[in-house]
Amino acid sequence: MRLWEPPRQIVQQLSYLSAVRQRLIQVYNLLAVPLAEQESFVSTSLQKKLQATSKKSLVALKDGQKAIDSQISALIDGDGRLKKLFELIVSVPGVGPTTATEMLVASNEMKSITDPKKMACQAGVAPFVYSSGTSVRGKTRVSHQAQKRLKSLFHLGAMSAIRIKGEIQDHYQRKGSEGKNKMLVLNAVRNKLIHRIYAVVKRGEKYDKTYLSPLA
């Protein structure tokens, strides 16, 4: 049994930066979306005033997000273990830098959550109830906000994966033509992405479809 290891300081920093990045995105969306919604019933002159007032804030929020992204990249690039894990994770089609960063944080750089089924359960995408001799509650439990971020990111990853020509796209289209519930099929794709991430990390080699078993 692997003993629990507290997150290294650099992982704690990544966690903080990731959370700040998410807040910036949320504030940006809160400010930008209402402006778009108002276009249908607000006069043109008022629209221009609102846009001018909000533009500087929106630009500042975007700049803040870019600055956070740069800090995250610098931390990962400056740490040998994190850089290696990051490169392995983003090699999986459909998995981007933000998802990889969140995975590193949530799993304590793949030390605390070493089982893909457990990660799927923590991320809220497991098509089953995970059970084992060790409770999923406790020191390895991911915070509620982190769970929401992971689930959202894996949803975006699945949406990206089904647009990429290959095994996952074929599987999604085949199941759809069979009349399967699209959300259930999409959830299976989310779960598959997690398993592929853990597979490449275990092998220590970037994604290669010839090494991995096909979707059921």
Model-found features: residue ranges?
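Short helix-capping/linker segments at secondary-structure and domain boundaries
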Residues: 1-2, 108-112, 161-167, 195-209
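Long, charge-rich intrinsically disordered scaffolds of nucleic-acid metabolism proteins
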Residues: 1-88
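Short, solvent-exposed helix-loop connector elements
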Residues: 2-15, 43-46, 138-141, 170-187
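Short coil/turn segments at secondary-structure boundaries
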Residues: 5-6, 35-37, 75, 132-135, ...
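Low-complexity, acidic/Ser/Thr- and charged residue-rich accessory regions of DNA metabolism proteins
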Residues: 134-138, 171-216
